[in-house]
């Protein structure tokens, strides 16, 4: 409508001055009327207390495929699903890809510490701010404030060993690796309450999968890479606490991070190598972590992938044109990759459904897995009774349920992957058909 007004105004040629003014006034009044109407529509939507429908629903073309045809397509995909073992690179290949990383992290960690830590020799001016150039500090205000506090303590925490100034450096003892929208935040916040667990922001640095390649946000092209030293700086608050406890010759404190992309996101290779690496990347995140931390432990919490898709807020009624990350729900594909380098007892896989229904049992399993000390009854109740974190916002629920045909197609699509997951974990509850060994 606006384009019609514009073109009519451009091509309007009237010699008489009065006619020109009249036409101009008419054009302006139409445009103003249109804008006023648009503002009224938007305002009425924004002021609505429900907002249960989209403001502008896309035009739905008459379906060319019947629901039966769609079911047949999904079933045909399921028949082609095959699980093949991947080629695991050897350490020499990894060292060629990440030479600096292997020069920073030693092959052995300090023996009297539960958390993987080591002393790093300092070079250059020790009076300079060691965190001034840290890219995490520039990206997160909260981290910047922490770094400012650490900078004031930096020289005091240096130790002299073999005549050289050194600082204590640490990596996480365990990682919460996924999946998105499956309860990682709730696990993280409950673990924070254990006296032996020391967690620092951010919860999700996404360094292994994204920022070390220069990807700040998912889907963006790479920019400036975040060095390993900047990642290690995030754990300096914990390193300081562990160093203080070393006065007692040992420390049981551990730290972690919970980037929900660690389990599945290897998309950075597309930017770095394109299609030149063949059918799969030359190495995955887990290969590097295993080479550096062969004894690391990992927690993955999963939910019914159909429900996970709905919670992401993209599969909503009247909207069939939004990109969906279906691959995130292919849990077994990623789990098999992790099990190609780490043993089964280093991976704890939970279901969100079980965790939500019985958090006390779920957290007890996690504490045993991490070999954490016993808790008082009061602290145990505090952890298990803590309100759930990062639950679905009420306004998201107003979008309504998933369309029945969408749910059915997703169930068909994920079925062979869920079945294989249940076989790998020897637990039928991971088929998400209502059975569970843990509830």
Placement of each model-derived feature along the sequence:
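PAPS-dependent sulfotransferase catalytic domain
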Residues: 30-33, 38, 52, 196-197, ...
